[in-house]
From Swiss-Prot:
Name of the protein described by the UniProt record: 5'-AMP-activated protein kinase subunit beta-1
Consequence of changing W100L: Partially inhibits glycogen-binding
Transmembrane segments: none
GO MF annotations, alphabetized: protein kinase binding
KW Lipid biosynthesis (keyword) present: yes
Designated gene of the protein: Prkab1
Cystine residue pairs: none
Family designation: Belongs to the 5'-AMP-activated protein kinase beta subunit family.
Region Disordered: start-end pairs: 1-43
Function: Non-catalytic subunit of AMP-activated protein kinase (AMPK), an energy sensor protein kinase that plays a key role in regulating cellular energy metabolism. In response to reduction of intracellular ATP levels, AMPK activates energy-producing pathways and inhibits energy-consuming processes: inhibits protein, carbohydrate and lipid biosynthesis, as well as cell growth and proliferation. AMPK acts via direct phosphorylation of metabolic enzymes, and by longer-term effects via phosphorylation of transcription regulators.
SUPFAM superfamilies: AMPKBI-like (SSF160219), E set domains (SSF81296)
Subunit-level organization: AMPK is a heterotrimer of an alpha catalytic subunit (PRKAA1 or PRKAA2), a beta (PRKAB1 or PRKAB2) and a gamma non-catalytic subunits (PRKAG1, PRKAG2 or PRKAG3). Interacts with FNIP1 and FNIP2.
One GO BP annotation of this record: positive regulation of cold-induced thermogenesis
Tissues showing expression: Highly expressed in kidney, heart, white adipose tissue, lung and spleen.
Length: 270
Protein backbone atom coordinates (compact mmCIF):
# COMPACT_ATOMS: atom_id res chain seq x y z
CA UNK A 1 0.00 0.00 0.00
CA UNK A 2 2.87 2.37 0.70
CA UNK A 3 4.62 1.89 -2.69
CA UNK A 4 1.72 2.86 -4.94
CA UNK A 5 3.65 5.22 -7.24
CA UNK A 6 6.32 2.65 -8.08
CA UNK A 7 3.69 0.00 -8.86
CA UNK A 8 1.83 2.40 -11.12
CA UNK A 9 5.00 3.21 -13.05
CA UNK A 10 5.72 -0.49 -13.51
CA UNK A 11 2.22 -1.15 -14.86
CA UNK A 12 2.52 1.71 -17.33
CA UNK A 13 5.86 0.40 -18.61
CA UNK A 14 4.32 -3.04 -19.15
CA UNK A 15 1.38 -1.53 -21.09
CA UNK A 16 3.74 0.47 -23.31
CA UNK A 17 2.59 3.89 -22.02
CA UNK A 18 4.94 6.71 -21.23
CA UNK A 19 4.02 9.35 -18.74
CA UNK A 20 4.55 12.83 -20.17
CA UNK A 21 7.06 14.86 -18.24
CA UNK A 22 6.16 18.31 -17.12
CA UNK A 23 8.53 21.18 -16.58
CA UNK A 24 8.60 23.43 -13.55
CA UNK A 25 5.74 25.57 -14.91
CA UNK A 26 3.40 22.58 -15.18
CA UNK A 27 3.37 22.35 -19.04
CA UNK A 28 4.30 19.47 -21.27
CA UNK A 29 7.56 19.54 -23.16
CA UNK A 30 7.52 19.89 -26.96
CA UNK A 31 8.86 16.39 -27.48
CA UNK A 32 6.03 14.86 -25.46
CA UNK A 33 3.12 16.89 -26.92
CA UNK A 34 0.41 14.69 -28.53
CA UNK A 35 0.46 14.64 -32.31
CA UNK A 36 -2.47 16.16 -34.29
CA UNK A 37 -4.17 13.81 -36.74
CA UNK A 38 -5.92 16.01 -39.26
CA UNK A 39 -8.50 13.44 -40.34
CA UNK A 40 -9.18 12.04 -36.90
CA UNK A 41 -12.51 12.82 -35.19
CA UNK A 42 -10.64 13.21 -31.92
CA UNK A 43 -8.74 16.31 -33.07
CA UNK A 44 -11.33 18.70 -31.69
CA UNK A 45 -11.02 17.19 -28.22
CA UNK A 46 -7.30 17.93 -28.15
CA UNK A 47 -7.94 21.66 -28.00
CA UNK A 48 -9.94 21.34 -24.80
CA UNK A 49 -6.81 20.31 -22.95
CA UNK A 50 -4.71 22.88 -21.18
CA UNK A 51 -1.55 21.80 -22.98
CA UNK A 52 -2.62 23.24 -26.42
CA UNK A 53 -1.46 26.78 -27.08
CA UNK A 54 -3.73 29.50 -28.55
CA UNK A 55 -1.79 30.05 -31.86
CA UNK A 56 -1.95 26.37 -32.71
CA UNK A 57 -5.66 26.27 -31.96
CA UNK A 58 -6.33 29.26 -34.20
CA UNK A 59 -4.28 27.69 -36.98
CA UNK A 60 -6.28 24.47 -36.80
CA UNK A 61 -9.62 26.29 -36.74
CA UNK A 62 -8.59 28.31 -39.81
CA UNK A 63 -7.63 25.11 -41.63
CA UNK A 64 -10.94 23.50 -40.67
CA UNK A 65 -12.86 26.55 -41.95
CA UNK A 66 -11.06 26.44 -45.31
CA UNK A 67 -11.83 22.75 -45.59
CA UNK A 68 -15.53 23.35 -45.04
CA UNK A 69 -15.57 26.15 -47.62
CA UNK A 70 -13.91 23.94 -50.23
CA UNK A 71 -16.38 21.14 -49.60
CA UNK A 72 -19.35 23.38 -50.37
CA UNK A 73 -20.59 23.13 -53.94
CA UNK A 74 -20.05 26.31 -55.97
CA UNK A 75 -23.13 28.28 -56.98
CA UNK A 76 -24.39 27.41 -60.45
CA UNK A 77 -23.93 30.15 -63.02
CA UNK A 78 -27.08 31.37 -64.76
CA UNK A 79 -27.18 33.02 -68.22
CA UNK A 80 -28.12 36.68 -67.75
CA UNK A 81 -28.96 39.14 -70.53
CA UNK A 82 -27.80 42.76 -70.35
CA UNK A 83 -29.30 45.19 -72.87
CA UNK A 84 -28.62 48.86 -73.54
CA UNK A 85 -31.31 50.67 -75.57
CA UNK A 86 -30.09 54.25 -75.18
CA UNK A 87 -28.12 54.38 -78.41
CA UNK A 88 -24.47 55.18 -78.87
CA UNK A 89 -21.50 54.04 -80.91
CA UNK A 90 -19.46 52.10 -78.34
CA UNK A 91 -21.07 50.60 -75.24
CA UNK A 92 -19.30 48.68 -72.49
CA UNK A 93 -20.61 46.84 -69.44
CA UNK A 94 -18.94 46.90 -66.04
CA UNK A 95 -20.08 45.39 -62.77
CA UNK A 96 -19.27 43.76 -59.49
CA UNK A 97 -19.26 40.35 -61.18
CA UNK A 98 -16.14 41.17 -63.26
CA UNK A 99 -14.32 43.45 -60.79
CA UNK A 100 -15.69 46.51 -62.63
CA UNK A 101 -13.70 45.87 -65.77
CA UNK A 102 -15.16 47.06 -69.09
CA UNK A 103 -16.74 44.40 -71.28
CA UNK A 104 -17.81 45.39 -74.84
CA UNK A 105 -21.44 44.83 -75.81
CA UNK A 106 -22.52 43.46 -79.19
CA UNK A 107 -24.68 45.65 -81.41
CA UNK A 108 -28.06 44.14 -82.32
CA UNK A 109 -29.88 46.56 -84.65
CA UNK A 110 -30.43 49.64 -82.44
CA UNK A 111 -29.57 47.88 -79.16
CA UNK A 112 -26.42 46.58 -77.49
CA UNK A 113 -26.59 43.14 -75.90
CA UNK A 114 -24.37 40.88 -73.80
CA UNK A 115 -25.12 37.49 -72.24
CA UNK A 116 -23.05 36.54 -69.19
CA UNK A 117 -23.11 33.54 -66.86
CA UNK A 118 -23.55 34.98 -63.36
CA UNK A 119 -23.79 33.17 -60.04
CA UNK A 120 -26.98 33.44 -58.06
CA UNK A 121 -27.27 36.52 -55.90
CA UNK A 122 -27.24 40.30 -56.16
CA UNK A 123 -25.00 42.10 -58.65
CA UNK A 124 -24.41 45.76 -59.45
CA UNK A 125 -23.49 47.00 -62.90
CA UNK A 126 -23.13 50.12 -65.02
CA UNK A 127 -22.73 51.11 -68.67
CA UNK A 128 -19.88 53.01 -70.30
CA UNK A 129 -21.40 54.73 -73.35
CA UNK A 130 -19.19 56.77 -75.68
CA UNK A 131 -16.72 57.61 -72.91
CA UNK A 132 -19.25 58.40 -70.17
CA UNK A 133 -20.46 56.29 -67.26
CA UNK A 134 -24.22 55.98 -67.02
CA UNK A 135 -26.96 53.65 -65.82
CA UNK A 136 -30.19 52.37 -67.33
CA UNK A 137 -33.10 54.34 -65.80
CA UNK A 138 -35.60 51.67 -66.82
CA UNK A 139 -33.92 49.04 -64.63
CA UNK A 140 -33.69 48.86 -60.80
CA UNK A 141 -31.02 51.11 -59.29
CA UNK A 142 -29.17 51.41 -56.00
CA UNK A 143 -27.38 54.45 -54.56
CA UNK A 144 -24.21 54.07 -52.52
CA UNK A 145 -23.17 56.22 -49.55
CA UNK A 146 -20.99 58.31 -51.87
CA UNK A 147 -23.96 59.05 -54.12
CA UNK A 148 -22.95 56.70 -56.93
CA UNK A 149 -25.96 55.30 -58.80
CA UNK A 150 -25.65 51.77 -60.21
CA UNK A 151 -28.08 49.32 -61.69
CA UNK A 152 -28.79 46.22 -59.66
CA UNK A 153 -29.94 42.77 -60.72
CA UNK A 154 -31.07 39.74 -58.74
CA UNK A 155 -30.15 36.36 -60.21
CA UNK A 156 -32.53 33.83 -58.67
CA UNK A 157 -32.77 30.10 -59.14
CA UNK A 158 -36.55 30.31 -59.38
CA UNK A 159 -36.25 32.39 -62.56
CA UNK A 160 -34.65 29.42 -64.34
CA UNK A 161 -36.83 26.56 -63.10
CA UNK A 162 -38.60 26.36 -66.45
CA UNK A 163 -35.28 26.16 -68.33
CA UNK A 164 -34.00 23.54 -65.91
CA UNK A 165 -37.13 21.46 -66.49
CA UNK A 166 -36.72 21.77 -70.26
CA UNK A 167 -33.07 20.75 -69.93
CA UNK A 168 -34.04 17.66 -67.95
CA UNK A 169 -36.64 16.75 -70.56
CA UNK A 170 -34.13 17.20 -73.37
CA UNK A 171 -31.63 14.99 -71.55
CA UNK A 172 -34.27 12.31 -71.10
CA UNK A 173 -35.13 12.48 -74.81
CA UNK A 174 -31.50 12.59 -75.96
CA UNK A 175 -31.27 8.79 -75.92
CA UNK A 176 -32.81 7.91 -79.29
CA UNK A 177 -31.87 4.24 -79.06
CA UNK A 178 -35.28 3.44 -77.58
CA UNK A 179 -37.15 5.42 -80.24
CA UNK A 180 -38.29 3.93 -83.51
CA UNK A 181 -39.87 5.46 -86.58
CA UNK A 182 -41.78 2.24 -87.33
CA UNK A 183 -45.05 1.39 -85.59
CA UNK A 184 -44.96 -1.47 -83.09
CA UNK A 185 -46.00 -4.94 -84.11
CA UNK A 186 -44.65 -8.02 -85.89
CA UNK A 187 -43.02 -7.74 -89.31
CA UNK A 188 -42.53 -10.31 -92.08
CA UNK A 189 -41.20 -10.45 -95.65
CA UNK A 190 -44.24 -11.88 -97.38
CA UNK A 191 -45.28 -9.81 -100.44
CA UNK A 192 -48.68 -8.19 -100.54
CA UNK A 193 -51.14 -10.10 -102.71
CA UNK A 194 -54.18 -8.23 -103.88
CA UNK A 195 -57.50 -10.00 -103.79
CA UNK A 196 -59.25 -10.86 -107.09
CA UNK A 197 -62.22 -8.67 -106.28
CA UNK A 198 -59.88 -5.75 -105.69
CA UNK A 199 -58.02 -6.32 -108.95
CA UNK A 200 -61.10 -6.20 -111.16
CA UNK A 201 -63.03 -3.60 -109.21
CA UNK A 202 -64.66 -0.95 -111.38
CA UNK A 203 -63.95 2.73 -110.76
CA UNK A 204 -66.40 4.52 -108.50
CA UNK A 205 -69.56 5.86 -110.06
CA UNK A 206 -69.63 9.58 -110.71
CA UNK A 207 -71.95 11.32 -108.27
CA UNK A 208 -75.16 12.32 -110.04
CA UNK A 209 -74.97 15.97 -109.02
CA UNK A 210 -71.72 16.28 -111.00
CA UNK A 211 -73.42 15.16 -114.21
CA UNK A 212 -75.23 18.47 -114.53
CA UNK A 213 -72.39 20.51 -115.96
CA UNK A 214 -73.50 24.06 -116.65
CA UNK A 215 -71.30 24.33 -119.72
CA UNK A 216 -73.31 21.60 -121.42
CA UNK A 217 -76.63 23.29 -120.75
CA UNK A 218 -78.38 25.39 -123.33
CA UNK A 219 -79.23 28.91 -122.30
CA UNK A 220 -82.69 30.21 -122.90
CA UNK A 221 -83.55 32.79 -125.51
CA UNK A 222 -84.36 35.37 -122.85
CA UNK A 223 -80.99 34.90 -121.12
CA UNK A 224 -77.79 36.70 -121.92
CA UNK A 225 -75.55 34.23 -123.78
CA UNK A 226 -72.51 35.61 -121.94
CA UNK A 227 -74.01 34.62 -118.59
CA UNK A 228 -74.44 31.14 -117.17
CA UNK A 229 -77.01 29.92 -114.69
CA UNK A 230 -76.02 29.81 -111.03
CA UNK A 231 -74.21 26.52 -110.36
CA UNK A 232 -74.80 24.17 -107.49
CA UNK A 233 -72.34 24.51 -104.63
CA UNK A 234 -71.11 20.93 -105.11
CA UNK A 235 -69.90 21.83 -108.62
CA UNK A 236 -67.39 24.36 -107.35
CA UNK A 237 -63.63 23.81 -107.40
CA UNK A 238 -63.79 20.84 -109.76
CA UNK A 239 -61.85 20.46 -113.00
CA UNK A 240 -63.99 19.44 -115.95
CA UNK A 241 -62.69 18.20 -119.31
CA UNK A 242 -64.64 18.20 -122.55
CA UNK A 243 -64.20 15.41 -125.04
CA UNK A 244 -61.48 16.16 -127.55
CA UNK A 245 -62.99 17.55 -130.74
CA UNK A 246 -61.13 18.88 -133.77
CA UNK A 247 -57.82 18.39 -131.98
CA UNK A 248 -58.71 20.72 -129.11
CA UNK A 249 -59.24 19.81 -125.45
CA UNK A 250 -61.31 22.12 -123.26
CA UNK A 251 -60.89 22.37 -119.48
CA UNK A 252 -63.11 24.33 -117.13
CA UNK A 253 -63.38 25.19 -113.44
CA UNK A 254 -65.88 27.24 -111.46
CA UNK A 255 -65.00 29.29 -108.37
CA UNK A 256 -67.02 31.53 -106.12
CA UNK A 257 -65.98 35.00 -104.99
CA UNK A 258 -68.44 36.20 -102.34
CA UNK A 259 -71.79 36.25 -104.22
CA UNK A 260 -70.41 35.90 -107.73
CA UNK A 261 -69.38 32.77 -109.65
CA UNK A 262 -66.58 32.76 -112.20
CA UNK A 263 -66.10 29.95 -114.70
CA UNK A 264 -62.75 29.72 -116.48
CA UNK A 265 -62.25 27.88 -119.78
CA UNK A 266 -58.88 26.65 -121.00
CA UNK A 267 -58.44 25.56 -124.65
CA UNK A 268 -55.44 23.39 -125.39
CA UNK A 269 -54.61 22.02 -128.84
CA UNK A 270 -53.70 18.36 -128.92
Amino acid sequence: MGNTSSERAALERQAGHKTPRRDSSGGTKDGDRPKILMDSPEDADIFHTEEMKAPEKEEFLAWQHDLEVNEKAPAQARPTVFRWTGGGKEVYLSGSFNNWSKLPLTRSQNNFVAILDLPEGEHQYKFFVDGQWTHDPSEPIVTSQLGTVNNIIQVKKTDFEVFDALMVDSQKCSDVSELSSSPPGPYHQEPYISKPEERFKAPPILPPHLLQVILNKDTGISCDPALLPEPNHVMLNHLYALSIKDGVMVLSATHRYKKKYVTTLLYKPI
